[in-house]
UniProtKB/Swiss-Prot annotation:
PROSITE patterns referenced in this protein's UniProt entry, alphabetically: CKS_1, CKS_2
GO cellular component: cyclin-dependent protein kinase holoenzyme complex; SCF ubiquitin ligase complex
SMART domains with a match to the protein in the record: CKS
PANTHER family: CYCLIN-DEPENDENT KINASES REGULATORY SUBUNIT/60S RIBOSOME SUBUNIT BIOGENESIS PROTEIN NIP7 (PTHR23415)
Keywords: Acetylation, Cell cycle, Cell division
Protein's organism: Homo sapiens
Keyword set includes Transmembrane: no
Originating gene: CKS2
Disulphide-bridged cysteine pairs: none
Modified residues (N6-acetyllysine): K4
Protein name, UniProt field: Cyclin-dependent kinases regulatory subunit 2
Length: 79
């Protein structure tokens, strides 16, 4: 990964959600709030680009530059 680029993981799934993680360059990661999960407006302002429906659902304390996202699977794909 280039140090100035945002990296998007492949998507992975469980019975209810589709997941992906996004790795920010260290400089950008300094702008990630430590007190709350980001709204879509906040993560888009950082330059993260994804389709609609993704939610920042967890803060990974050891690596705050990695943003964890999920969105519900369509009903017909849920187990």
């Amino acid at each position: 990964m280039a140090h100035k680029q945002i990296y998007y993981s492949d998507k992975y799934f469980d019975e209810h959600y589709e997941y992906r993680h996004v790795m920010l360059p260290r400089e950008l990661s300094k702008q990630v709030p430590k007190t709350h999960l980001m709204s879509e407006e906040e993560w888009r302002r950082l330059g993260v680009q994804q389709s609609l429906g993704w939610v920042h659902y967890m803060i990974h304390e050891p690596e705050p530059h990695i943003l964890l996202f999920r969105r519900p699977l369509p009903k017909d794909q849920q187990k």
